[in-house]
UniProtKB/Swiss-Prot annotation:
Database matches in Gene3D superfamilies: NAD(P)-binding Rossmann-like Domain
Protein name per UniProt: Saccharopine dehydrogenase-like oxidoreductase
Family to which the UniProt record says this protein belongs: Belongs to the saccharopine dehydrogenase family.
Cysteines joined through disulfide linkages: none
Encoding gene, per UniProt annotation: SCCPDH
Pfam families (alphabetical): Sacchrp_dh_NADP
GO BP field: glycolipid biosynthetic process
UniProt keyword terms in alphabetical order: Acetylation, Oxidoreductase, Phosphoprotein
Modified residues (Phosphoserine): S217
GO MF annotation list: oxidoreductase activity
InterPro entries per record: NAD(P)-bd_dom_sf, Saccharopine_DH-like_oxidrdct, Sacchrp_dh_NADP-bd
Gene Ontology, cellular component aspect: lipid droplet; membrane
Length: 429
């Protein structure tokens, strides 16, 4: 992608937010990466110069780079001020948007980026926002030749590219995949910043509008190849991983389905069915999550209930979410593993009347999911936009990560930066 002689190749918008601080650190690492062959001019953007400077100073101390603050531009920008968003977009080739919940704050950034010929990457895990932005802005982005790529953090690059990786590694036709997410933590346990909790509360509280949006889109169904993938019970046991699991309620399924539609309709690839689950451990964890889930699903239906869920986040989430977010010790001790079980047909075997005769198991592993892996994924996606434009879809538009990056070297870059893709087993039966 041409940098268009703009002052900054990258601008991190919302750099002083909880997630934005991690993205800022990751861009700073990329700036001095031994692999870089050219200078990476970049900036941070937000409402407060003082807060942005503090973020840069903390990153400088952590990375041992005392001159970092003087190397990075600062742009004062407010989500409620469209003119300031325009000024930010005009100075960037790619904006990394870290300001959420995106259902409230994401659209003005996308609009400003498209109008000013700037590409944009976000880390939204909100299906309604992601799908609505496609319908509203895909054609406009294509006309401008810019790339708007959502869900480019832990939601949903590991899942979306994990399915593509599994397809690429199968010697035949992949027809169905189940993924199982395992989150590991240290002695201090897990914690997630309440921004993620708020996005979930608002998303579940507005599910009817997502259903309405999908009905109005009136898209023809993607064909099912091979046997239809059976959905598991709300609580099921995964023998291969020796753990109980529940359906994963994030954006992964929505994103992967949209990617598979794109690959089928635009690249004539055989579509893959997909289901996502998260491992919750033993029966004690199952009972605890059942209570938390029942409370959540009851209260999220009502306006006052949503207010209570947001006001008393720590209580209703059983301590998994907090306004302070995880400590550095919790982050350092956390990691994730996403295991993919795929099935399909070897070359020459028709999926019409036969049973699947190939099984494949792959994994994506990485450091702490919500902030460390998210930052790595987001920044490496931006590097692809800047450096590998020839492998992107020829026209711009609004894309899922898989649709945008399926033919790029993003998986290779992620492997080099600590998010590892691997084949565990592959058998023909």
């Amino acid at each position: 992608m041409a940098t268009q002689q703009r002052p900054f190749h990258l601008v991190v918008f919302g750099a002083s937010g909880f997630t934005g601080q991690f993205v800022t650190e990751e861009v700073a690492r990329e700036q001095v990466s031994p692999e870089r062959t050219s200078h990476l001019p970049w900036a941070v953007a937000g409402r407060s110069r003082e807060k942005l400077l503090r973020v840069l100073e903390r990153a400088a101390m952590k990375l041992g780079r005392p001159t970092l603050s003087s190397e990075v531009g600062i742009i004062i920008c407010d989500i409620t001020n469209p003119a300031s968003l325009d000024e930010m977009a005009k100075q960037a080739t790619v904006v990394l948007n870290c300001v959420g919940p995106y259902r409230f704050y994401g659209e003005p950034v996308i609009k400003a980026c498209i109008e000013n010929g700037t590409s944009c990457i976000d880390i939204s895990g909100e299906p309604q926002f992601l799908e609505l932005m496609y319908w509203k802005y895909h054609e406009k982005a294509a006309e401008k030749g810019v790339y708007i790529i959502g869900s480019s953090g832990f939601d949903s690059i590991p899942a979306d590219l994990g399915v593509i990786y599994t397809r690429n590694k199968m010697n035949g036709t992949l027809t169905a995949v189940e993924s199982f997410l395992t989150i590991s933590s240290g002695p201090e346990g897990l914690c997630v910043h309440d921004g993620t909790w708020k996005s979930a509360v608002y998303g579940f509280g507005d599910k009817s509008n997502l259903k309405k949006l999908r009905n109005e889109s009136d898209m023809k169904p993607v064909p099912i190849v091979g046997p239809k993938l059976k959905r598991r019970w709300p609580i099921s046991y995964c023998r291969e991983l020796n753990s109980y699991s529940i359906p994963f309620l994030g954006a992964d399924v929505s994103v992967v389905k949209r990617t598979q539609r794109y690959l089928h309709e635009n690249l004539e690839q055989s579509p893959v069915q997909y289901a996502a689950y998260i491992n919750v451990g033993g029966i004690t964890s199952v009972i605890k999550l059942m209570f938390a889930g029942l409370f959540f699903l009851f209260f999220v239906r009502f306006g006052i209930g949503r207010q209570l869920l947001i006001k008393f986040t720590w209580l209703f989430s059983f301590g998994y979410f907090s306004k302070q977010g995880p400590t550095q010790k919790q982050i350092d001790a956390s990691s994730f593993t996403m295991t993919f079980f795929g099935q399909g047909f070897s070359q020459g075997v028709s999926p019409v009347k036969n049973k699947p005769n190939i099984r494949i198991c792959t994994q994506v592993k990485g450091p702490e999911a919500g902030y460390v892996s998210t930052s790595i994924a987001m920044v490496q996606a931006a590097m692809i936009l800047l450096n590998d434009a020839s492998d992107l879809p020829k026209a711009g538009g609004v894309f899922t990560p898989g649709a945008a990056f399926s033919r790029t070297k993003l998986i290779d870059r992620l492997n080099e930066h600590g998010i590892e893709f691997s084949v565990i087993s592959s058998t023909e039966v």
